[in-house]
Amino acid sequence: ESELFAELRHLADQLCSLFSKNLEKYDNDKHIHTDDLPGWKDHFWKSNNIRKAHLKTIEPVGKNKMWLMHINVFPSIYCDMPIFGLDIVATPNKVSGVFCDYSKTYNGFSTDLMQEYFRETVKDLSWNRERELPPWAKEIFSVDMMAAGSVRPGEELDQLCETALKLTSFYLESSSIVPYKTKIDTTAAQNKYCENQKMNKMLHSSILAMGIPEDVKDQYVDNVLFEVIK
């Protein structure tokens, strides 16, 4: 059994606890394929200022030999807050991919403060590398996006876990004090984020490579992962 997977599972549990402490858990009735996605576990939360927080883990089952965690937190469309995203992909011996961002949906004071905190938190991480992003990603992610192609067990992994917890805690604490303003409407920006994420060819090919049928993948991506606000 991989020690790395055990550490990452512990991180996922800690993050779930943070979400449950700050938000209200709910069942997502659009997630209709729970039995068709072996090894997948999806959790959902919401609050007055968070319309959907989603944490998903995928265990190495069947064709899939990797462990994955995906987090997206979408604020209310009436809040001056970025979208929070975190993805971790690991093989049994190393973390092979990390992406994390506070992605702007509104040019406002709260978003600027939150992005400044993000910048300060990630700027000195030695394993954080600037990556050339595809056009769909450049349109939605911030210039300070955290990205790594390899994080080694030990000190680097400890830093990653600590950073993930810090960025999640700060985001959730901020969400409870950011004012709700009906003159703000970030529907278009949030929908653009979801539409652009769906342009990621790796997203689709990686799910299909796990042996998930195309129709199940499409329903999940369009209605659970990145559904647009109608």
Regions found by a protein language model. Give the residues of each.
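Detector for Asparagine
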Residues: 22, 28, 48-49, 64, ...
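Intrinsic-disorder-associated interaction segments
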Residues: 1-8, 12, 107, 153, ...
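Alpha-helical oligomerization segments
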Residues: 169, 173-230
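Short Lys/Arg-enriched alpha/beta "domain-start" segment
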Residues: 1-79, 83
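Generic detector of well-ordered alpha-helical segments enriched in charged/polar residues
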Residues: 9, 13-16, 20, 115, ...
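Extended, non-transmembrane interaction/recognition domains
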Residues: 68-189, 196
